[in-house]
Amino acid sequence: MHSNTAVIALSALAALVPAALAGGNLGTANVQNACGKDVYLWSIADSAGEKMITLKDGETHSEQYRANSNGGGISIKMATNPDHKDISQFEYTVSEPQVFYDLSNIDGYPFAEGGVSIHPSDSSCPAVVCEGGVKECKEAYNQPKDDHATHGCPQETDLNVVLCAGGGSAGPKKMFKPVQEKAANRPRHPHARPE
């Protein structure tokens, strides 16, 4: 009897998360391809069954922030091959009134040659800059406990990711210096397992 009540309560709570997100002013996640060749994206909520997006050079994929059904974050998996292997992940989680974001290279870093950057539309929020030619970006997750790589901004802030931001066949892009953020204000990685 108690388990049925708990299941009903959790189901109702899970249904409220997307509704709560719809009620506020939410920003947009944008991923721009500056690599000079096609790149492949998968915007993942609950499962890896989402459709592959082929992003041609110069194109941008945009999506308004959303949540998965358990209230967790979204992972936009980014690759240079359509086989869903060797991926970088742009991850965001809306937790009113903020959006938390990071770049994860735990499952590969196919953009090491050209680099990756994340520039929030709110200039007071920290940028993430992984310069081209660097095999391990210190501003990204390279190990599961690299929590220094998670940043937060107001939830209405757009997050602009540029793939091959530091080069590629499309040439170098303007690089921005990231704003330093106090370590005490950083949350744990939004997709991390509990300790």
From Swiss-Prot:
Keywords: Disulfide bond, Secreted, Signal. It is found in: Secreted. It comes from Arthroderma benhamiae (strain ATCC MYA-4681 / CBS 112371) (Trichophyton mentagrophytes). Its main location: secreted. It comes from the Eukaryota. Residues 171-195 are annotated as: Disordered. GO terms for cellular component: extracellular region. This is Antigenic thaumatin-like protein ARB_01183. Coiled coil: none annotated. Disulfide bonds join 125-153, 130-137. Residues 1-22 form the signal peptide. Belongs to the thaumatin family. Might be involved in the inhibition of growth of fungal competitors and pathogenicity. SUPFAM superfamilies: Osmotin, thaumatin-like protein. Residues 185-195 have a biased composition (Basic residues).
